[in-house]
Amino acid sequence: MLVATLALLVACQPRPARHEPVQAQEFDISAVAKSDGDMVVEINLRQSQRYLRELARKLYARNPNQLRRGRYTTHDTALNALFGPRRLTHYPGLRGKRSAQAIGLAFDEDFHGDRVAAFIEGLRTMLMDAYDGKDSFYIYDVLDPQKLHYLARNFEIAFWKLRHDRDSEDRLFLVSNSLYGGGNLSFERLAGKLIGLQDLMAKVVADGSNRQIKNVIQRVTSVVFFPI
């Protein structure tokens, strides 16, 4: 199971263009303290962050007014504020909110800030909470598979809200897929990948630690996020 998962996640990694030389990865002494499972977790987390960045890019493209709300001039500056190496611990303009509360701002009619940033930062911090706030993992690190399972369910709820939540004038807070027939399904694909990665990771961690995942049945339309 672990080997198959590692192979699947590696296959998801972006490949260099043909004209780009393949560079050997430098040896890192810290890798000695990593198990195969730790490497799977790190790959999964990095890939999830890439998907969130891609989701943010697409949402800004469909909702350019949110760039102006965030006082950004380009997609790149907005994305760097969310994901760049110099990003702030608390994203500005979200009233200090994060995780589920930040996602809630994206669909709050009284919020006049950048709704794309609120939605993405909420997902990003929720993701990091499920991975115990770490981006490197070692043999002694043990994740909670229940948190990862709840993360997948929370992503389902967040994407349901993205597709359905409207303001008092019946307008979507954020435009994602086209409202017309044959619309762009790229948002649906990204949502499916993000949810699927967390479900897969929850199972891998549960199997590796002999822990059971409690499946909680809840209607997505109840829009109550699970605590992580």
Q: How does the language model describe each region?
A:
Residues L8-A11:
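C-terminal motif of bacterial Sec signal peptides marking the signal peptidase cleavage site
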Residues Q13-A118:
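N-terminal Sec/ER secretory leader and immediately downstream segment
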Residues Q13-A17, N215-I228:
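Long, compositionally biased low-complexity regions that are usually intrinsically disordered
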Residues R69-A202, S209-Q212, V216-V220:
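Mature extracellular/secreted ectodomains of secretory-pathway proteins
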